[in-house]
Swiss-Prot record:
Zn(2+) 1 binds at H111, H113, H191, D213. Zn(2+) 2 binds at H116, D213, H259. One of its GO terms (molecular function) is metal ion binding. The keyword Zinc applies. Its EC number is 3.1.1.81. PANTHER family: 102 KBASES UNSTABLE REGION: FROM 1 TO 119443 (PTHR42978:SF2), QUORUM-QUENCHING LACTONASE YTNP-RELATED-RELATED (PTHR42978). It comes from Agrobacterium fabrum (strain C58 / ATCC 33970). This is N-acyl homoserine lactonase AiiB. Binds 2 Zn(2+) ions per subunit. It is an enzyme of class 3 (hydrolase). The lineage of its organism: Bacteria, Pseudomonadati, Pseudomonadota, Alphaproteobacteria, Hyphomicrobiales. The gene is aiiB. Its cofactor is Zn(2+). Transmembrane segments: none annotated. SMART domains: Lactamase_B.
């Protein structure tokens, strides 16, 4: 039995396009009043069913992230609001597949921002894989009560309220096999302090390279590559995009970007089928 990959649609976030593609719009003496553009970008997770493991890549936003008593700070809700019906939250998407969080053996967290690690608290029985530098960054924001970043203090408080099986990837560990045909990749610093990807081999096609926000869209990917508007480390980001290209092309893998509207619309969603 080969691997199966399910694409989970977890709603959307509405953002200024400049967040995704740096300098998408800018004023000039000839055009002094150019307006920014709002776009809706997909929030996603990926479920890989293997012979002896069930691996989840990312967890989306917390179902209660928005509203007066929402997890997200008011400014985050204003700047980049989450949009999604109840069927788009992660526990519900798993239920639609006949699964619960307890059925997931391993959760790989590409990074710990609000739209990727919002549902960590549901996975009390799973191994949670995160980059050690990313974990340290998230905990620092929590410990200092800093609400100014995409690391959500209320989410992190819930993660740390009970013991969990954290597996932190060190800076020097470049790649690790999680299951036959499923490899964890350490992209290092770039969009965030520590980014992780997942290479998934399939039987009926070469497979996919899941890169999350290490590269937002095909426009960022290029060539020529274009930087995102939200970056922790520009040099690390450039290096990561180059590494992603080399890795994917040498293995004939299709890169699945973090927030590409056109690409995501073209994918088979978990409600309609899977890739194998």
């Amino acid at each position: 039995m080969g691997n199966k990959l399910f694409v989970l649609d977890l709603g959307e976030i509405r953002v200024d396009e400049n967040f995704i593609i740096a300098n998408s719009t800018f004023v000039t003496p000839q055009k002094p009043t150019v307006s920014s553009r709002l776009i809706d970008i997909p929030v996603s997770a990926y479920l890989i069913q293997c012979t002896d493991a069930t691996v989840l890549y990312d967890t989306g936003c917390h179902p209660e992230c928005m509203g007066t008593n929402g997890r997200w700070p008011a400014q985050s809700q204003l700047n980049a609001p989450y949009i999604g019906a109840s069927e788009c939250n992660l526990p519900e998407r798993l239920r639609q597949l006949g699964l619960s969080p307890d059925d997931i053996s391993t959760v790989v967290l590409s990074h710990l921002h609000n739209d990727h690690a919002g549902c960590v608290e549901y996975f009390g029985k799973s191994r949670l894989i995160a980059h050690e530098d990313e974990f340290a960054t998230a905990v620092r924001y929590f410990a200092t009560g800093d609400h100014s970043s995409p690391y959500i203090v209320k989410d992190i408080e819930a993660w740390l309220a009970t013991p969990r099986n954290w597996d932190l990837v060190g800076r020097d560990e470049r790649e690790r096999e999680l299951a036959p045909g499923v490899n964890l990749l350490n992209f290092g610093t770039g969009h965030a302090s520590g980014m992780l990807g997942l290479a998934v081999r399939l039987e009926k096609q070469p497979g996919f390279l899941l890169v999350s926000d290490a590269c937002y869209t095909a426009t960022n990917y290029g060539p020529p590559a274009r930087r995102a508007g939200v970056l922790h480390d520009t040099i690390g980001y450039d290096r990561t995009v180059s590494h992603i290209r080399q890795y994917a092309e040498s293995r004939s893998l299709t890169v699945l970007f973090g927030h590409d509207r056109e690409q995501f619309a073209s994918l088979i969603k978990s409600t309609d089928g899977f890739y194998e």
